[in-house]
């Protein structure tokens, strides 16, 4: 069984645009949820992006669980697209504030966090964990 069509390239983009593909896939394009992909499902040069995306999305889901945005035993993939997107925005904003040391009372809109790629967030997480 192929999780992605031949010639598939792992997407590079911002977190919120990739969110639904990560958890729900794209049936029209024949792409399974990206979270299900393994190293053998992507070309060599995309393996790094797959690993980086996994780390970032796991971090966001962990925040959602810790903050009670997901109920006990609930996983992001089981809540449906609409609720998943709402949870993602809240949890990602919290992660962004933590990584960039932004006060909770400061207006986050000026930071244009929706434009930040998962690679940039991964780099920030990695530097913080050193």
Roles of regions detected by a PLM:
Residues 1-66, 70-72:
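Intrinsically disordered, low-complexity regulatory segments of eukaryotic
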Residues 59, 63-130:
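Charged, low-complexity regulatory segments of eukaryotic nuclear chromatin/transcription proteins
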